[in-house]
A protein has these predicted regions:
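Active-site and adjacent substrate-binding regions of carbohydrate-active enzymes
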Residues: 1-579, 587-588, 592-609
């Protein structure tokens, strides 16, 4: 009886708004009734352990905003082979005091071409190469015991062309053809092409693919084997919601909703950031708050800062709990290569101007490339040529520019537009790989300093940090992908290599490269234990009076923590005279911010005395 009352109480809170939004979007009472039945069934199927977690999280809604949050992302197979073996590696994760683990897509996918798992064949089943649903459930249970929340991708925009819905559509089933955007001729597709940008103009040109089995054109925003779902069909929303609830009941606590700005299609638009996207995300948020309030939504929104606030919704009607901080990641790498933090500061100022409910997952590298989506209007105001700057950056991180320390590769280079993205691990892009090849210990020291500088700046930002697995031991590029015919065409595989367990053994040996990074990550965790990393802390940039130095300030009550980050290879002065008073370092040294001297690539953290 108590369980029924709990569900009824949560549902009553959202019933009117959920039903209003669903009917406004779909005008389909039958679909709404199916959705509400699925919600009740998912709640009833939820384990007592997970329901207890729901209660705990409801009592502490800011749990993911606390300073102890520290994340990592990885591919299951590259780290451990499969889910069972990954569970055996938990001591390594616990050693790092992780609280958040994002496993790259692990649901059933076609092989070998699956866009790194983002072409999903079955949203309810773990891919057999990685294990079973029981293995996933066992892993989430062990992670919870260790205080680690599991994040999985939920690919909302599309399915694999081999998904059972797509296979039924190919066989002529009109019901499932309506799950996608299918057209008999090019009339409507050509109208879409006039306004919809191409994601991969070179490797996957156009937004439509001819399906010979159906004799129809199907919308494929990304690759030809990824069919865009038709969210104008209420059955699609209901079925996808059913799947996310199923995964939540296996113990998944965070969902990274992939490519969410793309999910609604409308002729005459770019099919990006449309109002109906927010209706769908808001409905999904309410469903989760009713059935499994412990679960958090993390949006993947690769858009300008001005577009981001909408994806958080409002405090009264929230959508995503947090977003990937793509823009700052790009600007951190840009500042390092340019030795100029002005663009980074401007971008951070735009983020800091967002409402208080906006929260970010900060990172340097992940499974994807670095796309140089810098703010061209700000670049021009600063006297920077946007195109030349972009070309400089991707050539620099390719290692194909005089004086570059980096080793990487280009991704999706387009000679017609001069556009390209960058691939490589953090360590290799910071110069570790090149220094080791040359046997240059001075260059290696600088490379490690760059690596730690970026990580420290990233961990200081509003939100919480997420490491890319291997960064904690300075893992290098995996050039052997070029010998694999199934992987050679995608240069992102350069930074998708097997975890080097032999190198990991060196992490506790003083004087090793691995220990330098390992200890550096430990210092970040100590830094974030400060009360200035509480959810209600105020974060802002400050004028350092030196374009090569980024200044960040965290303040909570009477406590103030200042971070100064020298993005150059030279000693650099900074002056923050408006921040008066005496400051001290962690080891007790006194610093006066009116006149500070920083060493090359130094990250200086000082607390107001």
């Amino acid at each position: 009886m108590a369980a029924k009352q709990e569900f009824a109480s949560r549902f009553a809170k959202h019933k009117d708004e959920l039903e209003w939004l669903f009917m406004e979007l779909y005008h389909n009472r039958e679909g709404l009734e199916v959705l509400e039945r699925e919600m009740a069934e998912a709640y009833n199927a939820r384990s007592a352990e997970l329901k207890a977690l729901d209660k705990a999280r409801s009592a502490d809604p800011d749990w993911y905003k606390r300073g102890n949050m520290f994340g990592m992302t990885m591919y299951t197979d590259l780290f451990a082979g499969n889910l069972k073996e990954l569970a055996k590696k938990l001591p390594y994760l616990k050693e790092q005091k992780l609280t958040y683990l994002h496993l790259m897509p692990l649901l059933r996918m076609p092989h070998p071409h699956n866009d790194g798992g983002y072409a999903v064949e079955d949203f309810d089943t773990v891919d057999p190469t990685l294990g079973t649903n029981k293995d996933l459930e066992n892993l989430t249970r062990e992670l919870r015991k260790a205080g680690i929340s599991l994040c999985l991708d939920f690919v909302m925009n599309h399915t694999a062309s081999t998904h059972r819905w797509a296979m039924a559509a190919k066989a002529g089933d009109a019901t499932y053809q309506a799950y996608y955007h299918c057209y008999d001729d090019r009339t409507i597709p050509d109208q879409y092409e006039q306004t919809v940008p191409q994601v991969f103009p070179n490797t996957a040109p156009g937004n439509f693919t001819w399906c010979e089995e159906m004799h129809k054109w199907v919308l494929t925003t990304f690759h030809d084997y990824q069919w865009d779902l038709n969210y104008a069909n209420p059955a699609v929303f209901v079925d996808m919601t059913k799947s996310i609830l199923h995964l939540a009941n296996l113990g998944v606590e965070v969902f990274r909703i992939d490519a969410v700005p793309y999910i609604w299609k409308q002729l005459g638009t770019t099919c990006r950031n449309l109002p109906q996207v927010h209706t769908i995300v808001r409905m999904l948020r309410m469903v989760l708050e009713v059935v499994c309030p412990a679960v958090v939504l993390k949006g993947e929104v690769v858009m300008a800062p001005k577009e981001l606030a909408a994806y958080f919704g409002t405090p009264e009607k929230p959508e995503c709990h947090m977003l990937y901080n793509v823009s700052t990641m790009v600007n951190l790498w840009g500042a390092l290569a340019s030795r100029d933090t002005r663009l980074l500061k401007a971008q951070l100022d735009a983020l800091h101007a967002l409402p208080d409910n906006c929260w970010f997952v900060n990172y340097l590298r992940c499974h994807d490339d670095i796309g140089w989506g810098l703010d061209e209007a700000i670049e021009e105001k600063l006297g920077i040529d946007p195109q030349k700057h972009k070309e400089y950056l991707y050539h620099f991180y390719e290692g194909n520019f005089p004086g570059s320390w980096a080793k990487g590769e280009l991704y999706n280079y387009d000679p017609a537009t001069g556009d390209a993205r960058s691939c490589g691990t953090t360590a290799s892009l910071c110069g570790v790989e090149q220094a080791l090849e040359k046997g240059d210990n001075i260059a290696l020291d600088y490379a490690v300093k760059r690596d730690l500088l970026l990580h420290t700046a990233m961990a200081f930002l509003q939100g919480f940090p997420m490491l890319n697995c291997g960064d904690e031991i300075a893992q290098l590029n995996g050039w052997d992908y070029k010998n694999d015919p199934d992987r050679v065409e995608d240069s992102r595989n350069l930074h998708r290599s097997k975890f080097n367990w032999e190198n990991a053994k060196q992490r506790t040996r003083k004087g090793t490269l691995q220990n330098a990074l390992w200890q550096g990550m430990e210092e970040l965790r100590k830094m974030r234990a400060d009360e200035c990393f509480s959810p209600d802390a105020w974060v802002t940039t400050w004028d350092s009076h030196n374009p090569g130095v980024l200044a960040l300030v965290r303040k909570r009550g009477e406590e103030t923590l200042v971070g100064l980050f020298n993005f150059t290879e030279y000693p650099a002065g900074a002056s923050l005279d408006a921040l008066g008073g005496k400051y001290t370092t962690a080891d007790g040294k006194t610093v006066w911010l009116a006149d500070v001297e920083l060493q090359p690539y130094q990250a200086l953290l000082v607390k107001k005395a």
